[in-house]
């Protein structure tokens, strides 16, 4: 099953461990709690099922207007509205890497059945946006926004 790191509450220590508390995440809401319910339902039926919990997935065929939004802001020389001080950490995982891992799980019947997957190092929102703007040789002008 492809689940999500949205099963972890926003206040949990990062990086999340597979045995970390799963609970409502105020940013993800029912998406995360529905993933928890799906995981539980699967494990009730198939106790040795595999569950992969990726963070933000990026790459070809991405239908989420996330990376493209930041690139569009950079192209248009728009300032970027940064939540808080931009220190919140994000973690990404390329769709090709997810496919490689899924293939390995299927072929090798790995011993670990629940896995958080993603790039080893998280990145702050501010650093991520800065890297995206740098793809266009630009430096973002940030506007800090509080909740």
Predicted regions and their residues:
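SDR active-site strand-loop-helix element
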Residues: 2-5, 52-54
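Active-site "gating" loop of Rossmann-like NAD(P)-dependent oxidoreductase/epimerase domains
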Residues: 5-29
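Conserved sequence/active-site signature of Rossmann-fold short-chain dehydrogenase/reductase
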Residues: 7, 57, 98
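A short C-terminal helix-loop "cap" of Rossmann-like NAD(P)-dependent dehydrogenase/epimerase domains
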Residues: 21, 71-83, 138-143
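Active-site Tyr-X1-5-Lys
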Residues: 25-51, 66
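Flexible, glycine-rich beta-alpha linker
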Residues: 52-69
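Substrate-positioning beta->alpha
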Residues: 64-70, 83-106, 113
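Mid/C-terminal beta-alpha module of Rossmann-like enzyme folds, strongest
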Residues: 104-147
């Amino acid at each position: 099953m492809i689940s999500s790191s949205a099963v972890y509450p926003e206040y949990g220590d990062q990086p999340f461990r597979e045995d970390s508390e799963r609970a409502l995440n105020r940013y993800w809401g029912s998406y995360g709690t529905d993933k928890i319910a799906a995981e539980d339902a699967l494990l009730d039926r198939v106790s040795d099922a595999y569950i992969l919990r990726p963070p933000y997935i990026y790459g070809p065929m991405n239908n989420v207007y996330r990376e493209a939004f930041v690139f569009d802001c950079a192209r248009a020389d728009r300032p970027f509205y940064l939540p808080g001080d931009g220190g919140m950490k994000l973690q990404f995982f390329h769709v090709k890497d997810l496919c490689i891992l899924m293939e390995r799980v299927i072929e090798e019947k790995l011993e670990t059945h629940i896995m958080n997957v993603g790039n080893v190092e998280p990145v702050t929102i501010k650093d991520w946006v800065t890297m995206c703007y740098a793809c266009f040789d630009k430096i973002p002008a940030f506007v800090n926004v509080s909740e």
